[in-house]
Amino acid sequence: MRNEYLICTECYVIIPRTNYHLEENNPVAQLFWGRCVIEKAAAFSYFNKGSRIRNLIHCLKYKGIKEIGFELGKIYGLSLTSSGFTRDIDMIIPVPLHPSKERIRGFNQSEIISRGIAGASTLPVEINTL
Protein backbone atom coordinates (compact mmCIF):
# COMPACT_ATOMS: atom_id res chain seq x y z
CA MET A 1 0.00 0.00 0.00
CA ARG A 2 1.23 3.48 -0.93
CA ASN A 3 2.02 5.99 1.80
CA GLU A 4 -0.40 8.92 1.26
CA TYR A 5 1.41 10.91 3.96
CA LEU A 6 4.62 11.06 1.89
CA ILE A 7 3.22 11.33 -1.63
CA CYS A 8 -0.35 12.55 -2.04
CA THR A 9 -2.67 10.91 -4.54
CA GLU A 10 -2.58 13.91 -6.89
CA CYS A 11 1.24 13.89 -6.98
CA TYR A 12 1.27 10.11 -7.41
CA VAL A 13 -1.09 10.29 -10.39
CA ILE A 14 0.76 13.08 -12.20
CA ILE A 15 4.31 11.71 -11.82
CA PRO A 16 5.60 11.96 -15.42
CA ARG A 17 6.47 8.28 -15.85
CA THR A 18 8.63 7.20 -18.79
CA ASN A 19 7.43 3.57 -18.91
CA TYR A 20 10.83 2.76 -20.45
CA HIS A 21 10.77 -0.57 -18.64
CA LEU A 22 8.14 -1.59 -21.21
CA GLU A 23 10.41 -0.77 -24.21
CA GLU A 24 13.54 -2.84 -24.84
CA ASN A 25 15.35 -0.23 -26.97
CA ASN A 26 14.33 2.80 -24.95
CA PRO A 27 16.29 6.09 -24.85
CA VAL A 28 18.08 5.15 -21.60
CA ALA A 29 19.27 1.83 -23.05
CA GLN A 30 20.43 3.69 -26.17
CA LEU A 31 22.69 5.89 -24.03
CA PHE A 32 24.79 2.80 -23.29
CA TRP A 33 24.99 1.45 -26.84
CA GLY A 34 28.64 1.17 -27.86
CA ARG A 35 29.85 2.16 -24.39
CA CYS A 36 29.35 -0.99 -22.35
CA VAL A 37 27.42 -4.23 -22.39
CA ILE A 38 24.11 -4.05 -20.56
CA GLU A 39 21.07 -6.27 -20.61
CA LYS A 40 18.39 -3.75 -19.61
CA ALA A 41 18.05 -0.09 -18.73
CA ALA A 42 15.12 2.09 -17.75
CA ALA A 43 14.16 5.30 -15.96
CA PHE A 44 11.17 5.87 -13.72
CA SER A 45 10.26 9.46 -14.48
CA TYR A 46 11.04 12.47 -16.58
CA PHE A 47 12.71 15.16 -14.48
CA ASN A 48 11.27 18.48 -15.62
CA LYS A 49 11.83 21.90 -14.13
CA GLY A 50 8.90 22.78 -11.92
CA SER A 51 7.48 19.25 -11.87
CA ARG A 52 6.28 17.57 -8.70
CA ILE A 53 8.79 14.74 -9.14
CA ARG A 54 11.54 17.39 -9.05
CA ASN A 55 10.11 18.72 -5.80
CA LEU A 56 9.96 15.20 -4.34
CA ILE A 57 13.57 14.44 -5.35
CA HIS A 58 14.71 17.77 -3.88
CA CYS A 59 12.93 16.95 -0.60
CA LEU A 60 14.89 13.71 -0.55
CA LYS A 61 18.27 15.16 -1.52
CA TYR A 62 18.30 18.53 0.18
CA LYS A 63 15.85 18.19 3.06
CA GLY A 64 16.91 14.65 3.92
CA ILE A 65 13.41 13.16 3.79
CA LYS A 66 14.66 9.66 2.98
CA GLU A 67 11.21 8.10 3.24
CA ILE A 68 10.22 9.89 0.02
CA GLY A 69 13.07 8.18 -1.84
CA PHE A 70 12.14 4.80 -0.42
CA GLU A 71 8.48 5.36 -1.37
CA LEU A 72 9.37 6.43 -4.94
CA GLY A 73 11.57 3.35 -5.23
CA LYS A 74 8.75 1.16 -3.99
CA ILE A 75 6.33 2.64 -6.54
CA TYR A 76 8.81 2.01 -9.35
CA GLY A 77 9.72 -1.42 -8.01
CA LEU A 78 6.06 -2.48 -8.16
CA SER A 79 5.89 -1.37 -11.82
CA LEU A 80 9.14 -3.13 -12.68
CA THR A 81 8.11 -6.35 -10.96
CA SER A 82 4.55 -6.48 -12.30
CA SER A 83 5.78 -5.91 -15.87
CA GLY A 84 8.32 -8.75 -15.64
CA PHE A 85 11.24 -6.34 -16.07
CA THR A 86 13.01 -7.70 -12.99
CA ARG A 87 12.64 -11.36 -14.00
CA ASP A 88 16.24 -11.82 -15.21
CA ILE A 89 17.91 -9.26 -12.96
CA ASP A 90 20.29 -10.47 -10.25
CA MET A 91 20.70 -7.33 -8.16
CA ILE A 92 20.16 -3.60 -7.92
CA ILE A 93 23.32 -1.49 -8.04
CA PRO A 94 22.82 2.14 -6.94
CA VAL A 95 24.92 4.81 -8.63
CA PRO A 96 27.64 5.82 -6.18
CA LEU A 97 27.66 9.37 -4.83
CA HIS A 98 30.94 11.24 -4.59
CA PRO A 99 32.31 10.57 -1.07
CA SER A 100 32.45 14.28 -0.17
CA LYS A 101 28.79 14.78 -1.15
CA GLU A 102 27.78 11.68 0.78
CA ARG A 103 29.60 12.99 3.86
CA ILE A 104 27.80 16.34 3.59
CA ARG A 105 24.37 14.86 2.83
CA GLY A 106 24.76 11.83 5.08
CA PHE A 107 23.32 9.38 2.56
CA ASN A 108 23.23 8.39 -1.11
CA GLN A 109 19.80 9.12 -2.59
CA SER A 110 20.34 6.44 -5.24
CA GLU A 111 20.82 3.84 -2.54
CA ILE A 112 17.63 4.94 -0.75
CA ILE A 113 15.59 4.66 -3.97
CA SER A 114 17.24 1.29 -4.73
CA ARG A 115 16.21 -0.01 -1.33
CA GLY A 116 12.62 0.99 -2.11
CA ILE A 117 12.79 -0.91 -5.41
CA ALA A 118 14.20 -3.90 -3.52
CA GLY A 119 11.35 -3.62 -1.01
CA ALA A 120 8.87 -4.16 -3.84
CA SER A 121 10.80 -7.07 -5.35
CA THR A 122 13.02 -9.92 -4.24
CA LEU A 123 16.19 -8.28 -5.54
CA PRO A 124 19.14 -7.54 -3.25
CA VAL A 125 20.86 -4.14 -3.26
CA GLU A 126 24.63 -4.33 -3.82
CA ILE A 127 26.34 -1.08 -2.81
CA ASN A 128 29.98 -2.12 -3.23
CA THR A 129 29.98 -3.12 -6.91
CA LEU A 130 30.76 0.21 -8.61
Predicted feature residues:
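Glycine-rich phosphate/pyrophosphate-handling loop used in enzymes and phosphotransfer proteins
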Residues: M1-L130
